[in-house]
């Protein structure tokens, strides 16, 4: 098995990192998936990555049909439309990985195309998006982690390794991918959400016992849910229990979204934990408050509270 026809769905911070790395290979057919006005914009303006303009091949889902390997790197609220694109692209041999945040995107995708097409994965890249520009440090980026649910190395995980070889991408295969995914989810919930509510840099976690307490409350609820689902987060590699190195002023993706007046992925973070908590009978008061607080900040950004 060799992956030669590669399709990337999503050209934001994560998609740009993947495109940057794979564009260094000259023996693959690499494309970004887009349609309509967005397709025209990318073809005209390109992708501005670390102050360099890349002009990707842009294909519609129909044009990319039969791809060997599909990499999903969209925001959570774009997943439903991305799934429709995936359904158009996938055929019998196609392998799909999702590099989205959260713990349920693989399930959503597999429900539409079948679990046999999906290799669970995650990514850790400390990136910043400003307008149409994406910045990241390739050297400090932890990168892509992938593996089969049963922990066995397979023909398709070895094909992923061969694809990533010779690029600037950082990657590794793991035999405990579900623990790794939940470990990253734990980091995202603990690091993204308290600072997003406050609008401050990550240094606040070490400088304020009160912010640290909020983070602890959010994470304890997540830990209880993971335990109830049989996920042992402690099995994750040490690199999955920490984020990429950042400065105290750093603002993670949820706060970056609010700063730019974009809607966030709070449905995927606290929203998912609230849903799972209800299913399992586990209270989630910290996540419920955080969910409503960030939703209210989105409404504020939308201009809903501009009273005269």
Please provide the spans of the model-predicted regions.
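A structural signal for isolated positions on well-ordered beta-strands in alpha/beta enzyme cores
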Residues: 7, 29-31, 97, 145, ...
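Short, well-ordered alpha-helices that flank and scaffold nucleotide-derived cofactor binding pockets
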Residues: 20-24, 84-88, 111, 271, ...
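Rossmann-like NAD(P)(H) cofactor-binding subdomain of soluble oxidoreductases
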Residues: 50-134
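Short, charged/polar "capping" segments at the starts of alpha-helices
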Residues: 38-43, 106-107, 154
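NAD(P)-dependent Rossmann-like dehydrogenase/reductase catalytic/cofactor-binding core
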Residues: 2, 216-308
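NAD(P)+-binding Rossmann beta1-loop-alpha1 motif at the extreme N-terminus of oxidoreductases
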Residues: 1-55
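Residues at the C-termini of beta-strands that transition into short coil/loop
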Residues: 34-36, 61-62, 100, 122, ...
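Internal alpha-helical scaffold of NAD(P)-dependent oxidoreductase catalytic cores
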Residues: 4, 41, 88-89, 112-117, ...
